[in-house]
């Protein structure tokens, strides 16, 4: 499997802590205690615990102890998890933690996978706004960084604009509007809508010229996001621009809960692809139904799979196994409706590996 979208995992052993398996990232001790209290009653955590117990050959109640023993050789343990999950390549966003982009060889060695980084644009915009840069200075800086990244091994670009000013992008935003938007009040991450809208359109044009895909966060996210701002249909006007039509765009996270909307965009926009990730970690039981709903409309040649794993290596492992279960479920339903076995085999190969290998030229 080529993991189409993920984040760095811990390079050193840390205690098993399912606090990571939560969409609530509110800071403080009270929020942390709430996550710990709710954790055992989240179905995803229950299923991850049971599955990990089977892998470690122990009772579910003994997972923490068995994992501590297994992880005494952390590198070997992490490598075994990725191998068991069948993950061979990682398309990674190394923007967090700080310094991760300089440690890609370590991630590759420990996981046993080839690592292909993508460049997230939003932190650069945030930093520029905070420093008082003009809109033109910010545009020039970010677009230049894209050019540099393309020449230094990066295979894609990414935006989490949904977390910032939302996906209701004005494709006609001007440099004047971009400058004016910098005078708005509020947190840095919510400022500069005109600038961020203008940048996205121009960045898509640069990505198209460079021949590199562009991932856009859609749908489900942690508690910082305003979910209504993450509907992929909000991108429709942007997707009609020449820059977007020339680009290869990957709408990530299955656009949860807007799966049909995502499938429609992938079916009707030649350059748009659908990535299924993240919800497999938090809504595992219905992930097969969600995959089926996308394959029911979108061409399988435009569907990619990812774990969106982060921090704890078990999340990559669990996410990949959920996706395999999901594919088996979707295949069974399609088979029941008459799909040929050879066709189903081709679809499985494409969505787990072939599509990503072709798109990112791996």
Please state what every model-predicted region is:
Residues 7, 95, 120-126, 160-164, ...:
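Active-site beta-loop-alpha junctions enriched in small/polar residues
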Residues 2-6, 89-92, 113-121, 157-159, ...:
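Hydrophobic faces of well-ordered beta-strands that scaffold small-molecule active sites
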Residues 152-260:
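Divalent metal-binding pocket/active-site signature
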Residues 80-84, 102-117, 145-153, 205-209, ...:
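Acidic (Asp/Glu)-rich catalytic clusters
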Residues 237, 245-248, 253-362:
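H/E-rich (His + Asp/Glu) clusters that bind or coordinate divalent metals
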Residues 119-140:
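A gly/proline- and charged-residue-enriched helix-loop-helix capping module
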